[in-house]
C-alpha cells in the first residue's frame, strides 16, 4: 500500500510501512552508511539516559533495512522526558560485518552522541551519517 496525505500544517508519507504522526514521535534515529551509500541495516545501537557521569541503559536494538529502529520511535511524546540522553552506535561491528578491511585498532569503534531534550512536545530526530573514518550528526526533523 502506498499513499501520501498532505494538509496545511501536517504531512504523513507512507511508502509501504506503518505510519506514526510526527506529533507522536518524541525521539528517533536514522543511520546512513556513507561509505556504501545505503542505510546502516544491522548496526547495533544502545540508548541511555544520563545524569552526570552515570548512564542507564534504556534499550538495545539493531537497525532495520531502512537504518531505523524496527519498533518505531525510541520514545513517543507521551513518554519522552526532559533530560540528557546518549545514543551509542557500534560502528566497528557494523563495518566489520560488511567485510570492510579495518586496521587494528580501528579509527572509530563506537560513536556516542550525548544530547539534551529540553522540549518534550517536540520531535527530536538524531540522524548519523557514518563511515569507518568519519561521522556527522545534526538535529533532524
Task: Identify the role of each PLM range.
Residues 118-141:
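Compositionally biased low-complexity segments at domain edges in trafficked proteins
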Residues 24-114, 125:
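Beta-strand-dominated extracellular/periplasmic modules and repeats
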Residues 7-24:
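Short, Lys/Arg-enriched N-terminal segments with co-localized hydrophobic residues
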Residues 12, 47, 84, 123, ...:
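Intrinsically disordered, low-complexity N-terminal regions enriched in serine/proline/glycine
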Amino acid at each position: 500500500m502506498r499513499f501520501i496525505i498532505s494538509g496545511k500544517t501536517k504531512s504523513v508519507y507512507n511508502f509501504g510501512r506503518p505510519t506514526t504522526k510526527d506529533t507522536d514521535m518524541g525521539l528517533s534515529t536514522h543511520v546512513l552508511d556513507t561509505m556504501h551509500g545505503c542505510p546502516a541495516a544491522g548496526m547495533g545501537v544502545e540508548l541511555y539516559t544520563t545524569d552526570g557521569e552515570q548512564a542507564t541503559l534504556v534499550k538495545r536494538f539493531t537497525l532495520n533495512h531502512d537504518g531505523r529502529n524496527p519498533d518505531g520511535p525510541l520514545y513517543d511524546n507521551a513518554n519522552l522526558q526532559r533530560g540528557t540522553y546518549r545514543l551509542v552506535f557500534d560502528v566497528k561491528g557494523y563495518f566489520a560485518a560488511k567485510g570492510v578491511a579495518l586496521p587494528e585498532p580501528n579509527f572509530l569503534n563506537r560513536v556516542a552522541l550525548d544530547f539534551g531534550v529540553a522540549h518534550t512536545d517536540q520531535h527530536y530526530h538524531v540522524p548519523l551519517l557514518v563511515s569507518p573514518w568519519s561521522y556527522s550528526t545534526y538535529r533532524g526533523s
